[in-house]
C-alpha cells in the first residue's frame, strides 16, 4: 500500500493549484486574521456591500412592473399584473405584490430601483447570461469574476469578501485568489479531518512554490473558520426537508433568510469583511409563473427588508 504523505498530497494537489487556492483564498495565517477580527474590527459605519444573486433567470417585468404600459399587458395577457395588484412606486411602475417589505423601504427612502441594466446583444442562454453578469465580460468568456478581480487588485486578505455557502460562485474568483467560502453554522469538520487540514497548511521550508500555494489554501480554510467561529455561536440548523422556504443555489441547502441573518451577525460583530455574497435559486419559472415567482420574491423580500439588518449596508439583487 502506498503511504500518502503531506508532500505527496501537495504535489498531487498542485495539478489543481488554482482551484485549491481559489477554494481557500488568501495568503495570510489564521493567527493574523483572528487578531484583526478582535483587535482591529471593521470601524462602525463602514460601507458594506451584500450581493444577492438570483439564479434561474428572474422575470424582471413582473418584478418591477410597468403596470400602465399597454404593451406590457398585450404581450402577457395571462400573467400581467394590474394597477390594483402591485405596490405602486409612481404613476407608471410598481413592485410585485409579494414585495411588501421592499415597498415599505421605498416609502422610507431606503430602496432604489435601477432599470434597464444590461449589455449589447443579450445572450438568451441562462448559463451564458449568468456567466456574463458574474464576470462582466460580455464579449468573451473569462475565468475571473468581478469581485475576484477587485480582490486581486486590492490585497490578499481572505475575509475581505465572503460567500455564504460552500460553493464559491464565479463572481468571487480572481486570478490570484478568491473570496472565502463560509458555510452556515460553526466549523463542522470532524476533529480528525480538521487536524489533518491544519497539518497540511503548516509551513515547511522544503516546499516548492506550487506546494506553498496549495498548503496556503488549506491554512486559509482554517483561517476563515477560526475568524468567524466566535461570531457564529451555535450552529444554524438547516431547514427541514418539508420547509417551503426556497433554497439558495450557491448557498447550499440554506434558505436566504438564514444567509442574511448570518451576514447581519457578522456585520454587527465587526468582522473585517466589506463584501458578502448570498444567493437564491429557483427563478427558472415556466409553469405557474406568477405563483412560483411570488414565492421566490417573497423569500427575497423577507430577508432583504428584515428589521434585524444593521443600519449600514447595501444589498444588491441581480434580477
Locate each region found by the language model.
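Feature for exported/extracytoplasmic and membrane-associated proteins, marking the mature portion
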Residues: 1-302, 306-312
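Acidic/histidine-rich, metal-coordinating catalytic segments
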Residues: 316-319
